[in-house]
């Protein structure tokens, strides 16, 4: 009998002081009540790059194909996937509708590869509200960002 595909939740967030500036990202993975936190940062980055990185790094931790719900407060990341922007950008050689080049192409390409492995749904959550996991991700991302401010 084939084992049922695992259902994983991933909460993500990115933080940046200045844009560009020092930044951090975080993800919390939840599977059957077990939680795993990851975080990291860069000395000179953008908020969007940190938001995308959080999703990519979270998905990279999965060791087998999973059903995944990604919760993000980044409308940019959620809409890029759920509204088909990402596929359109790729089809148009990474040129947006406004004729400008998409930023962070390498990360978007990595995300596309991961989306082909996992069945991923993105859900937009309100940032800095009452969502416990989003708030924890925010604190982790800010903490990593702050390491570059000292």
What would you call each of these model-derived segments?
Residues 1-4:
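A short acidic-Thr-Gly-centered motif at the start of a beta-strand
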Residues 8-10, 70:
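Residue-level marker for buried hydrophobic side chains located in beta-strands
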Residues 32-50:
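A short, polar/acidic, helix/strand-boundary loop motif
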């Amino acid at each position: 009998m084939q084992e049922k595909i695992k259902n994983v939740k991933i909460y993500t967030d990115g933080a940046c002081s200045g844009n560009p500036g020092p930044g951090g990202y975080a993800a919390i993975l939840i599977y059957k009540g077990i939680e795993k936190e990851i975080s990291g940062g860069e000395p000179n980055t953008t908020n969007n790059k940190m938001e995308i990185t959080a999703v990519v790094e979270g998905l990279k931790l999965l060791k087998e194909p999973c059903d995944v719900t990604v919760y993000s407060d980044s409308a940019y990341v959620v809409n890029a996937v759920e509204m088909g922007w990402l596929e359109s950008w790729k089809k148009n050689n990474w040129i947006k509708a406004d004729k400008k080049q998409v930023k962070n192409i390498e990360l978007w390409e990595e995300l596309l590869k991961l989306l082909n492995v996992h069945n991923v749904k993105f859900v937009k959550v309100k940032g800095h509200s009452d969502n416990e996991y989003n708030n924890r991700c925010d604190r982790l991302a800010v903490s990593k960002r702050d390491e570059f401010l000292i």
